[in-house]
Amino acid sequence: MAQQAPDREKALELALAQIDKNFGKGSVMRLGEDVRPPIAVIPTGSIALDVALGIGGLPRGRVIEIYGPESSGKTTVALHAVANAQAAGGIAAFIDAEHALDPDYAKKLGVDTDALLVSQPDTGEQALEIADMLIRSGALDILVIDSVAALVPRAEIEGEMGDSHVGLQARLMSQALRKMTGALNNSGTTAIFINQLREKIGVMFGSPETTTGGKALKFYSSVRLDVRRIETLKDGTDAVGNRTRVKVVKNKVSPPFKQAEFDILYGKGISREGSLIDMGVEQGFIRKSGSWFTYDGEQLGQGKENARNFLLQNPDVGNEIEKKIKEKLGIGAQLTDDVADDALPAPVDF
């Protein structure tokens, strides 16, 4: 026969007391006990993408996957997140498995290359072990792994060129993510995995595209971003950048399937000012009449390029537009909860 209500409550309290004694206070809690603070985020560098993500940026303490075709802007998006984390006083690390990180380009995007921790590992096991140790230190704010496809298992590197190694990389990723996910949440570190596209053979219906490294990353990711180049930006006959579309194909912290478009300028990265102009027009703060852009009765310029230059020369106007957009849409970028003032998170036990 089922226990009476008072007996059940007493049994539960005894069990909770024993759990707290064995595993520490807070191991089990009622969901409504504490009002949870808003999710802390790291801005992406594009107001359009911050809005599409629904919370104002990439969530802290979560796994993020950025994938897309070659030269679509995946690493650029990741480096902008690194720059924004560093600007707020955070510590960043970059696992360069592709051995292709350009320090000069990273510096142009605002990354403090002197403070950036960089590793160029020899094997996938080494890369993920380094990443795991950095995360468990509790001192890291953002970690980028570029890319999953370049995380080659040790057995494949040491074997012959024609050897078959079925499922090795998928098993490696699955084991690593099982270990990392809890540590990421405890330390508040954002882990960005950059991934490449492959095509499945013999697919008759639906998209043949898939990402490397098995299915584990798809499951463990809180946010998945599909980055595509949709247009080449030209100044006369010279190509000066790309128009990029990012689709939020998975989002555990806000409604998914939203899209953002922004400009990536060669040698400069994401055009923050261009993104502000696009969102300002969309939200009604900037008026577009013909080719002229006007804000609050003041002409920004004729044509988007002139308006962009005006905002570059008058950053206060750009900041004001950004503030109004965020207030209207109810998003804000709480980055690192005042990293400089607060104590760093406690290291995670190995």
Curated annotation (Swiss-Prot):
Q: What is its main location?
A: cytoplasm
According to its UniProt entry, the protein's GO biological process terms are: DNA recombination; DNA repair; SOS response
Which Pfam family, any one, appears in the UniProt record? RecA
Under Gene Ontology molecular function, one entry of this record is: single-stranded DNA binding
Q: Name one GO cellular component term.
A: cytosol
- Residue positions annotated to bind ATP are G68, P69, E70, S71, S72, G73, K74, T75
Keyword Cytoplasm included in the entry's annotation: yes
Q: Where in the cell is it found?
A: Cytoplasm
Q: Which UniProt keywords apply?
A: ATP-binding, Cytoplasm, DNA damage, DNA recombination, DNA repair, DNA-binding, Nucleotide-binding, SOS response
**Is DNA damage a UniProt keyword of this protein?**
yes
InterPro entries in the cross-refs: AAA+_ATPase, DNA_recomb/repair_RecA, DNA_recomb/repair_RecA_CS, P-loop_NTPase, RecA-like_C, RecA-like_N, RecA_ATP-bd, RecA_C_sf
Question: Family per UniProt?
Answer: Belongs to the RecA family.
Q: Which PANTHER family match?
A: MITOCHONDRIAL DNA REPAIR PROTEIN RECA HOMOLOG-RELATED, RECA
Known function: Can catalyze the hydrolysis of ATP in the presence of single-stranded DNA, the ATP-dependent uptake of single-stranded DNA by duplex DNA, and the ATP-dependent hybridization of homologous single-stranded DNAs. It interacts with LexA causing its activation and leading to its autocatalytic cleavage.
Write down what this protein is called: Protein RecA
Q: What is the lineage of its organism?
A: Bacteria, Bacillati, Actinomycetota, Actinomycetes, Mycobacteriales
- Give the gene name: recA
